[in-house]
Design a protein with these regions (language model features):
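Short, amphipathic alpha-helical interaction segments embedded in low-complexity terminal/linker regions
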Residues: 1-228, 242-244, 354-358
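Acidic, serine/proline-rich low-complexity intrinsically disordered regions
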Residues: 143-358
Length: 358
């Protein structure tokens, strides 16, 4: 047994060396630096930060490089590193209407206080390969408009709330749970649901959000507002007793305006779904908002008609680190289990053969 263990250990070490060599690739090609990943593969970095649960572009870039571009593996690496970090303080609640806007659009109102800002997007490209990028030419810098954007842009939902078109959502003062410290239970609070959706796999949430548009829990959404920009993060240390600004982060927020409800007390009003992610992960924020609203079906006495409305199904299968780990464990030796099933199958075949002989 000792020889087998040592032999396996050497094989694993060699496999890791081969993987590192494969990651490096052709030595005649310049090695990809973490700064290049962080600056030029920003959307991949944003996804890894969001689902990994750490806002650190450099660490996310390192994880992507170490994982050879496998984003799920990179998310796993970042999650593992996160568990080693001390918890120094809790930040104060972010006021996203104070965001320094980079992009802001609405599909429900053309004219907004503060205006709409198209910002950087692939939305209107023709999805044709740009072969000039193969020439390694320098991309010209985009022109900048000197016109200053408003420092504070009110949310579309805040305007709808003032008009009585949407219900006001207020903080009840309760301490939000922390899913990284407490195992989630079902039914979950909305705070716990949103935390799990943020860390959930983008592809999984995108598919669920798409399913709600195809009749599996239809809730008729409109993109009320999508905004991307920089926001200051503050903490209030007990020893100081006042707020201090510790930096700023890039966020994308999405609020979906959903079909109105008449089931609750008061006048009919629109409902909302909410998504908030690190960086410019706009598609993830939209999918998160769609699924968030779908999971509110019990709150509005709506019939559960699709998988996106099944809270336990959605939340217990959204985490790609957990899912990848369970699927990947099938690669580990299952010799004893298989031998047991093989012996059972042989006995069953023998019984069938005996019956046929009779």
């Amino acid at each position: 047994m000792y020889v087998a263990v040592k032999g396996g250990e050497k094989a694993i070490a060699s496999a890791h060396e081969l993987q590192a060599d494969l990651r490096r690739g052709d030595r005649d090609v310049a090695e990809l630096g973490c700064d290049q990943v962080a600056q030029q593969l920003g959307l991949a970095v944003d996804r890894v930060m969001t689902e990994g649960g750490i806002y650190d572009p450099q660490l996310a870039a390192l994880a992507i490089k170490q994982a050879s571009g496998d984003l799920v593996e990179a998310i796993f690496l970042l999650r593992a590193y996160r568990t080693t970090l001390p918890r120094l303080a809790d930040s104060l609640a972010l006021e996203t209407d104070e965001m320094r806007i980079e992009r802001r659009i609405s599909a429900v109102y053309k004219d907004l206080p503060g205006g709409q800002v198209l910002g950087p997007t692939y939305d209107y490209s023709h999805r044709l390969l740009d072969f000039t990028l193969l020439a390694n030419g320098e991309t010209p810098a985009a022109p900048r408009d000197d016109q200053a954007l408003p420092e504070r842009c009110p949310h579309v939902f805040s305007m709808m709330t003032k008009e009585g078109l949407a219900a006001r959502e207020e903080d009840d003062g309760s301490e939000p749970c922390d899913i990284t410290r407490e195992p989630p239970g079902y039914p979950a609070t909305r705070a716990a649901r949103l935390q799990q959706l943020v860390r959930g796999d983008e592809g999984f949430l995108l598919a669920l959000g798409y399913s709600t548009q195809r009749g599996y829990g239809r809730n008729h959404p409109f993109a009320g507002e999508i905004r991307t920009g920089y926001l200051s993060v503050s903490i209030c240390p007990e020893e100081l007793g006042f707020e201090i600004d510790i930096g700023e982060i890039l966020l994308t927020e999405c609020e979906m305006v959903n079909g109105f409800t008449t089931q609750t007390e008061g006048a009919p009003h629109f409902t909302r779904g909410y998504g908030l992610v690190f960086g410019r992960s706009e598609r993830k924020a939209m999918a998160m908002a769609l699924v968030d609203r779908a999971l509110q079906a019990p709150d509005y006495d709506e019939r559960i008609a699709g998988p996106a409305q099944d809270e336990e199904f959605v939340l217990s299968h959204a985490d790609n680190v957990e899912a990848a780990g369970f699927v990947s464990h099938l690669k580990l030796p299952h010799y004893v289990d298989f031998q047991a099933e093989l012996e059972l199958l042989k006995r069953l075949r023998e019984q069938v053969q005996e019956q046929n002989d009779e």
